[in-house]
Amino acid sequence: MDHATVMTLVQWMHGAEWRLTLQHSCPCHALVWMTRGQGVAVVEGVRRGIGVHNALVLPARTMFSLDPGKTGFGLVCEMPAQATAPMPDRPLHMRIRDVMGQNELTAIFEGMQREQNDARPFSEEVVDAQAALMSVWLRRAMLSQPEEPASGAAERLVRAYAALIERHHASTRSMADHARTLGVTPTHLTRVCRRLSGLSAAELLTERSLHAARDLIEASDRPMAQIAAELGFGSAAYFSRFILHHTGRTPSDLRSAARARIASPVATAARQVI
């Protein structure tokens, strides 16, 4: 992407909840602003509760999942990784208690939405300028946040494991291979991951692989055998069994359903509404 863009959490799902609820990453920076409800995020393997007036900053290529809950509503601003507006180089979860700060960020989001919806000349430049303003708001908010306690050994281990998953999920490396790289046993890694994320070490890796697979299946026309090879599966048959086991559907069924969903007038209308 070349310009900042804003959308609702529903739009960020692109018609499929798994796009947010499975472990994955974005090629761009993202700032999530919750305005209603209560959800759960797992960021770099650490589980966090996300509530109203919470801001979640996700630098590009940060592994995360987000479940906003049935009543959750929020807005997302995606910024290009190469954007001139400075963004933090680590994930942040901020609870914005100051009413003025809450109103300021909401106003920036609403201004960006208006520009996108009106599609006037030079609207992309205006949205980028508002994204720069959002960056200033963010840095000011960071100054007023209480200092975070130093991460413990368990959290550092899980974050390092999440980084390895994100870097090597399209390879043949197993959870045991990553544990060996980190200098711990698979049992210890599993125990720590489950305590901090609610998921085992193997489940974190599986979710990331599944997201990558479903994205290529549903958003591309590549042959299934090619996708299997790109993601480090030993064969197309094993890839198909993996998808069937975790989704209950074959890769071809998933692709057909995704195309039908995109072609649906209801889905098209939902993508247009903010």
Segments and roles (model prediction):
Residues 2-93, 120, 124:
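N-terminal regulatory/effector-sensing and dimerization cores
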Residues 184, 233-234, 249:
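The short coil/loop that forms the "turn" connecting the two helices of the helix-turn-helix
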Residues 95-100, 119-126, 136-182, 195-207:
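Short, Lys/Arg-enriched, Trp-marked, Pro/Gly-tolerant hinge/linker segments that flank
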Residues 53, 189, 238-239, 243:
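Short hydrophobic/aromatic patch on the recognition helix
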Residues 87-110:
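Aromatic/histidine-rich interaction motifs
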